[in-house]
């Protein structure tokens, strides 16, 4: 359902050989911050690279597995600038929204994040999210993954 023309799936062989261990370390750290200790195994289900260009976006969606993540490899300079929207508190060009529940008193349902190169964001697979388009020339390159968590019995 993506409005992005260039997504490349990374082979399981490459993933296992070069990326899986590092991602497992990052996921273990994320899980330990949540005080979860009975992890038996973390399996990276899949990983793909997304090349997003001017005007492209990824509509609201969620993932499979238990945890998902996005890492930012390249961002166009000035990606979040938008000359058409002066005096706006929230500028969404090229940003990512995480969406959960409904807006309620003292509770926001949308968390907007302005990515930076080298950011790695890990989140529950069911958390709805969207990547907004940007209106300048350049490439936003990221990778996304899904992971399954196996617990000790």
Language-model segment annotations:
Residues 1-38, 48, 55-58:
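Non-heme Fe(II)/2-oxoglutarate
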Residues 45-122, 139:
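Catalytic core of non-heme Fe(II) oxygenases with the double-stranded beta-helix
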